[in-house]
Amino acid sequence: MFGLFKGKKKEPKSPADEAPVDDTAATAPDAVAEQDEQPRLEAGLEKTRSRMGAGLRALFGGRALDDELLEQIEEELLLADTGIDATQSILDTLRREAKRAKTASEVRDILRRTLIDMLVPRESEPPEPPPGQPWVMLVVGVNGSGKTTTIGKLAQRLQAAGHSVALAAGDTFRAAAVEQLQQWGERVGVPVIAQKTGSDSAAVIHDALAHARSRGIEIVLADTAGRLHTQSNLMEELRKVRRVIARFDETAPHETLLVLDGGSGQNALVQARQFGAAVDVTGLAITKLDGTAKGGIAFAIVQETGLPIRFIGVGEKPEDLRPFEPEAFVDALLGQDTGAAVGSGSRG
Ligand SMILES: Nc1nc2c(ncn2[C@@H]2O[C@H](COP(=O)(O)OP(=O)(O)OP(=O)(O)O)[C@@H](O)[C@H]2O)c(=O)[nH]1
Ligand SMILES: [Mg+2]
């Protein structure tokens, strides 16, 4: 479930509470929930899947890998914003393996493995807070990328899983930003620590941390104003927010999550570079993948930044914000295994 929150589970209040909170044991209710999740993920990624997958599915359906098909696959991957480097390594794998493999299903398995490996980050161990201190996530990104919505959805999922959460209304810049977060707080039933628009973002977030510590709240999700790297005053504000959080607890923030709009394509790469340079981003959320055929950006971005994708947004509902799992993501893009033999299908 929330791999990110592993080891952060609340002690079960009673044995009956244990099953929904435990994300390591494969209990029966969890297994049922997972069965429903793959079709949901596939539906959310439908646009990307149709753009990047036709050539690949023809190959897996038994069509021989000739130059024409290779070109089609290359074009589809690039159109889905998979990026030149990631696309080339996918094509290299195909050229190499399609010769050796006896069945289309073998080619598929090898490509599947290659794609999954591409999504595995160069990750270092995330820090943990000292006992009695909240786990802190600072959420950053450009305007409208989905920061506040992602926080709301995460709060809902965490709350449902038995965690205690507080939200920090660190977007003190945009009018109505505080209200938007407060609405989420009310909806989910978690406290929102806020001051009025125009106040100091770092001070609001500091208040939220103090509130969480004094009440034994486990997790603080801190919203920030959307900003571009060119707005140097706002980028400096983010650095200050980080310094203030670190003064509260030197291990914090335990995650600095950069929220990227999946539809922004190659721009997302630029944002990852710029925010990474300014505030030491430790994880990514890619939102709005349901509305775009450019979901190949996930490969490009992990390849380039080495950062882990923590969550993806594939729809408007809270359950459409999903912890990112490379296997499930790749399976949703590639579709079902047909098991056909290489070259046995008609070329039409
Ligand atoms: N379809 C879809 N819409 C999303 C997703 N995530 C966010 N949105 C929508 O994107 C819009 C912007 O989301 P916000 O959460 O307000 O974005 P923000 O980054 O906080 O924006 P600023 O605070 O202005 O910087 C809202 O209409 C959300 O409903 C997603 O995964 N899928
Ligand atoms: Mg916002």
What is the predicted role of each segment?
Residues 1-118, 122-125, 132-133, 138, ...:
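Non-catalytic terminal/linker segments enriched in charged/polar, low-complexity residues
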Residues 85, 113-348:
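P-loop/Walker A NTP-binding module and the surrounding RecA-like catalytic core of P-loop NTPases
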